[in-house]
């Protein structure tokens, strides 16, 4: 099934198999990494008392986020929520079953046991991320996002009003904020 999904995704990506696709992937990765670096740099600047420099790093990070989003869209990387949950779960699965385990083995072979342990620990976190995404996907597939078989506590994401029941209200009875 993963191969079928990949084929469907490739059909949406008009750049599939080209150097342009590789360039778009590199642009997306570069902009994504720059965004994260700049948010880290903003934290340091703020801690050191450089509020204006911190704000500039954050503004630039937001610009880089938009650049990354542009390239990711070109690669047909953004779907509906169901497709995004599937892609996220698959990505997390790769990270914990393959990537981090291989990184850990290499780190051990090269004499970095502490780093190997850290790679494995992060791999465990990625496993939980996959499980969470798959549970959310199941909620969509079984129409259990806003309705459960057992009583739950539902909180309005706008005003904080609490409703206890099997179904979230379509509209908050306090602030009239819609469920969706």
Model-derived features: positions:
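Non-heme di-metal
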Residues: 10-180
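Short, Lys/Arg-enriched N-terminal segments with co-localized hydrophobic residues
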Residues: 1-9
């Amino acid at each position: 099934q993963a191969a079928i999904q990949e084929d469907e995704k490739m059909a949406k990506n008009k750049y599939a198999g080209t150097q342009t696709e590789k360039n778009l992937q590199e642009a997306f990765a570069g902009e994504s990494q720059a965004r994260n670096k700049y948010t880290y740099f903003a934290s340091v600047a703020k801690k050191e008392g450089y509020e204006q420099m911190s704000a500039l790093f954050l503004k630039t990070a937001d610009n880089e986020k938009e650049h990354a989003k542009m390239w990711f869209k070109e690669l047909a990387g953004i779907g509906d929520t169901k497709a995004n949950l599937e892609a996220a779960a698959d990505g997390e699965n790769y990270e914990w079953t393959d990537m981090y385990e291989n990184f850990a083995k290499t780190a051990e072979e090269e004499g970095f046991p502490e780093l190997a342990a850290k790679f494995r620990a992060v791999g465990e976190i990625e496993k939980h991320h996959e499980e969470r995404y798959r549970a959310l996907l199941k909620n969509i597939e079984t129409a259990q996002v806003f309705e459960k078989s057992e009583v739950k506590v539902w909180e309005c994401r706008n005003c904080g009003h609490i409703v206890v029941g099997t179904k979230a209200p379509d509209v908050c009875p306090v602030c009239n904020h819609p469920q969706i």
